[in-house]
């Protein structure tokens, strides 16, 4: 039980450290809003404020992405890059937990699998808050089941 708890704490620390470095668009260390990120934040905030997607505010992405962007805005009560950062870190932590479970079933080091995964996705994060990081969780869950 103690080893399991320690693995979870290490995974949470790994998710937080990775997020602080690679999710630069919304990091509390000094957010720098990127182009796609800015659009997602704008649409998420608009949905949180009751705007209708595709009629009152428009972008060409699917509605699920904007609903994911509305959640942190609703929970924070307004336009918040910190709330999006927390959501990103939680999604990454969930991905690491799925990878941990997969590694344990295969009898390999969870820590090694998680580090390998992070090394692969660091080039895909593009500053964070992009579709790639949100699609990783359902993809990993599909691979696990």
Where are these regions (language model features)?
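Extracytoplasmic loop-helix module adjacent to an early transmembrane segment
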Residues: 22-59, 71-74
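Loop-to-helix entry region of an early transmembrane alpha helix in multi-pass inner-membrane enzymes
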Residues: 63, 67, 76-94
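Structural signal for the C-terminal ends of transmembrane alpha-helices
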Residues: 143-145
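Transmembrane-helix signature of polytopic, membrane-embedded enzymes
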Residues: 90, 96-121, 136-137, 141
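Short acidic/glycine- and proline-prone juxtamembrane loop motifs at membrane-interface regions
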Residues: 125-135
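Aromatic-anchored segments of alpha-helical transmembrane domains
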Residues: 19-21, 118-123
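Start-transfer (signal-anchor) and selected internal transmembrane alpha helices
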Residues: 1-24, 104-107
């Amino acid at each position: 039980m103690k080893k399991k708890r320690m693995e979870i704490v290490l995974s949470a620390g790994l998710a937080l450290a990775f997020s602080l470095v690679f999710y630069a668009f919304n990091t509390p260390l000094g957010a720098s809003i990127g182009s796609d990120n800015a659009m997602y934040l704008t649409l998420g905030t608009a949905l949180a404020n009751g705007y209708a997607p595709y009629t009152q505010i428009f972008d060409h992405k699917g509605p699920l992405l904007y609903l994911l962007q509305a959640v942190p805005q609703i929970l924070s009560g307004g336009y918040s890059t910190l709330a999006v950062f927390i959501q990103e870190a939680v999604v990454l932590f969930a991905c690491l937990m799925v990878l941990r479970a997969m590694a344990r079933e295969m009898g390999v080091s969870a820590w090694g699998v998680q580090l390998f995964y992070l090394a692969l996705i660091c080039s895909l994060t593009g500053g964070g808050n992009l579709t790639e990081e949100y699609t990783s969780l359902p993809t990993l869950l599909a691979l696990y089941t």
